Swiss-Prot record:
Its EC number is 2.7.4.9. The keyword Nucleotide-binding applies. It catalyses: dTMP + ATP = dTDP + ADP. This is Thymidylate kinase. The lineage of its organism: Bacteria, Thermotogati, Thermotogota, Thermotogae, Thermotogales. One of its GO terms (cellular component) is cytosol. It is an enzyme of class 2 (transferase).
C-alpha cells in the first residue's frame, strides 16, 4: 500500500507520518519512508537545488517531477512490489497545490506531467493535514525557512485552497483537522487505516 501525507508547511504531516510508521511496524507490517523532493542520490541533489537556489516556476516544477520520477523507479515501485507499506512525506499532489495552484501553472497541466513522471503510480490513500495558514506561520516562526517556505501567507492560502479543491474530487483524499492535538489527529488517521487493513 502506498500512502502519502500532504499539507502546507507547519501542518504536522511529518509527525503523523512517523506515528503511522510506528503503528504499522507494531502491527507486523514492512514499512519504508520516503520524502519529496529527495529519497534517492539524484533526488537529494535536486532537493538542494530546489530549496536553496532561485529559479523560474517552470524549472521548479520540472525539477520536482525529475526527483519524483527517480524516486518511483528506484524506491517506490520496487517497495510496493515487495509488499511494503510506502509512506511518502509529500508526493504528486504537492506539485498540483504548489506549482499548479499557487504558482498558477494550472492543475490540469501538472496532473498530466505527474502521470508521465510517476508512470501512473499514485498513492492508494492521501492524508491532507489541514490547518489555517496563520497557525502554520506561527508554528514555522521558530524554524529556519527554505526558499519555498519563505513565500508568505498569500502563497500558502493558494496552496491550501488547491488542496481543499482536490479533496472534493477524490474519494481516497482524506482531509484531517490538523488544529487538534497530535494524538487526536493520529486517531483519525488510524481509524481510516484500520478500516483499510481490516477489509
Amino acid at each position: 500500500m502506498f500512502i502519502a501525507f500532504e499539507g502546507i508547511d507547519g501542518s504536522g504531516k511529518s509527525t503523523q507520518l512517523v506515528l503511522l510508521e510506528k503503528y504499522l511496524i507494531n502491527r507486523g507490517k514492512k514499512v519504508i519512508k520516503v520524502r519529496e523532493p529527495g529519497g534517492t542520490i539524484l533526488g537529494e541533489k535536486i532537493r538542494d537545488l530546489l530549496l536553496n537556489f532561485n529559479m523560474n516556476k517552470r524549472s521548479e516544477l520540472l525539477l520536482f517531477l525529475a526527483s519524483r520520477a527517480q524516486l518511483v523507479e528506484e524506491v517506490i515501485r520496487p517497495s510496493i512490489e515487495k509488499g511494503y507499506f510506502v509512506l511518502a512525506d509529500r508526493f504528486s499532489d504537492s506539485s498540483i497545490a504548489y506549482q499548479g495552484g499557487a504558482r498558477n501553472l494550472g492543475k490540469d497541466l501538472v496532473e498530466k506531467l505527474n502521470i508521465f513522471a510517476t508512470n501512473g503510480i499514485f498513492p492508494d490513500i492521501v492524508f491532507f493535514i489541514d490547518i489555517p495558514v496563520q497557525m502554520a506561520v506561527r508554528r514555522m516562526k521558530e524554524k529556519e525557512k527554505d526558499r519555498i517556505e519563505k513565500e508568505g501567507e498569500d502563497f500558502l492560502e493558494k496552496v491550501r485552497t488547491t488542496y481543499l479543491h482536490i479533496a472534493k474530487s477524490r474519494k481516497n483524499f482524506f482531509v484531517i483537522d490538523g488544529t487538534k492535538d497530535v494524538d487526536y489527529v493520529f486517531s483519525q488517521i488510524k481509524r481510516i487505516i484500520d478500516t483499510m487493513l481490516d477489509h
